[in-house]
């Protein structure tokens, strides 16, 4: 199974340009910035020394640092993941002045904001907040990180889409694809038909005309991987439940993991397992 973490998604490629990110910024914060040159993309791409990779991050005038993640399966652990990302971004930001961190001079930092754009099948919510404190074993307000989750499903956050063309167009693209899949088209058929539909209706037109083969590859892989992962998880759970024990359920998932049919990252991303269950699954 290919590793989605080392591949970009259509969302990241399309949304992650300076001009589109400026539109997202203005729509979310209700501002009116017009100069895309003020946007500095800071996305963590991973390297030989660090495998930390996020979807999109950028700064505007070095005042605001916005971190954006795209998900088709909502992950309740996003606050702690984003905490790791912003930690790495701050380390890189202060690198030129790192000696000052031990001085009496205060190092000024861009204010971070955290967003997830959800693109899955759950239409029960429009906007929700995920809080780092929800994961604490005992109540505490000493450290907090709030992630704002926006649902891109049809009929959700239409006011936001109305004022943000990139999000509106991506939502049309994605939701049309999902509609075709529900009608029985294969992944490849649905991707190709969606591209044609969007080009004909001037949706993501320029991007799709210049990147059609890449989009077919990326979007097809993204949704194939998602559907395969969910099917494997459901199959593993069914095997465990048939035994009538939670132990059997976890052992079945562990078998899938050891056989290379699912990854620990995929299990974490599914949001179906507690940290304790993941630790039990990971045991050899």
Q: Where in the sequence are the language-model features?
A:
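Elongated, amphipathic alpha-helical interaction scaffolds
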Residues: 1-284
């Amino acid at each position: 199974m290919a590793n989605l973490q080392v591949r970009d998604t259509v969302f990241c490629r399309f949304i992650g340009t300076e001009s589109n990110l400026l539109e997202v910024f203005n729509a979310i914060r209700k501002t009116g910035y017009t100069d895309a040159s003020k946007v500095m993309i800071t996305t963590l791409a991973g390297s030989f020394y660090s495998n930390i990779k996020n979807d999109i991050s950028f700064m505007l005038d070095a005042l605001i640092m916005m971190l954006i993640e795209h998900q088709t399966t909502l992950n309740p652990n996003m606050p702690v993941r984003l905490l790791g990302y912003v930690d790495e971004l701050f380390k890189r930001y202060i690198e030129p002045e790192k000696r000052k961190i031990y001085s009496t001079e205060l190092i000024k930092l861009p204010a971070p904001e955290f967003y997830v754009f959800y693109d899955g099948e759950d239409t029960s919510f429009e906007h929700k907040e995920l809080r780092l404190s929800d994961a604490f074993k005992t109540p505490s307000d000493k450290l907090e990180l709030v992630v704002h989750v926006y649902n891109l499903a049809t009929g959700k956050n239409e006011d936001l889409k109305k004022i943000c063309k990139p999000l509106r167009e991506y939502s049309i693209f994605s939701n049309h694809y999902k509609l075709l899949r529900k009608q029985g088209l294969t992944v490849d058929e649905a991707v190709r038909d969606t591209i044609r539909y969007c080009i004909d209706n001037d949706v993501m037109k320029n991007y799709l005309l210049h990147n059609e083969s890449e989009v077919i590859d990326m979007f097809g892989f993204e949704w194939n991987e998602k559907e395969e992962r969910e099917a494997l998880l459901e199959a593993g759970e069914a095997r465990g439940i048939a035994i009538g024990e939670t132990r059997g359920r976890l052992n079945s998932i562990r078998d899938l993991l050891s056989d290379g049919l699912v990854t620990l990252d995929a299990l974490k991303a599914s949001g179906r397992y507690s940290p304790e269950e993941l630790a039990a699954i990971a045991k050899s």
